[in-house]
Amino acid sequence: MIFVDYLGPTQRLPQVSEVVRREVSAAMRMRPDQVAVRRIVTDDDRDEVELWVELSTEEHLYRLGRQLAQRISAGLRPDGAGPQVWVMYRVVPLSNAFLNGEARGRGTATFE
């Protein structure tokens, strides 16, 4: 499961969800329903798209970060016009992710 936080106008959420699910699932070779796009409410009137994509390794960021940002931006700005699109990343190692109290990564979780 990949989580993507969207900060931006409510009216853009359907388009953002569609593009982000399509592009992230293609890049990560997973099903689109494995990409959760969550809108976070902000107190900002700008018509911009801000996305925070959670990845599990620095390698994903290195290999996919720029290309994924370009594909998402192109999908949300097909003619090169439209809102500014910010794509940023957080790396959350699987050893620090828990589902129903069980570690999602390989090996034992540590907090070092």
Please state what every model-predicted region is.
Residues M1-E112:
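Interaction-mediating elements
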